[in-house]
Amino acid sequence: MRIDNTLSLPMPPDAAWALLLDIPYIAPCLPGTQLTATIDDRRYQGTVSLRLGPIALTFEGEAEITDIDEAARRVTVRAQGRENRGRGSAHADVSFQVCERDGGTEVAVSTDLTLAG
């Protein structure tokens, strides 16, 4: 499934770009996300809890920054995990694109999400 979102930030694009690359700083801004370990400067372990209708799921896994394009202000993250009750798995490729908009910043977020189990 593909999910596309945008968000507006009242700051210059360069400042937003710097924050976007600080995963421990921005992780608490992502609903249901909790970092549990930093493996290195591009890989992190954590949990993501979400609801799909009446179903509540918590996935434990790893996220890795797979590409950083400084010139385009685009970063790509690959995340994968297993549901903590062992019933399923999730895999997501997420790209964040930072652009200047109306004196502030717009961040376009594109997610390709696969759930199994």
PLM segments and residue spans:
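Beta-strand/loop substructures that line and gate deep hydrophobic ligand-binding cavities in soluble
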Residues: D67, G81-G117
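Hydrophobic ligand-binding cavity/cleft-lining segments
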Residues: M1-R43, R51-G53
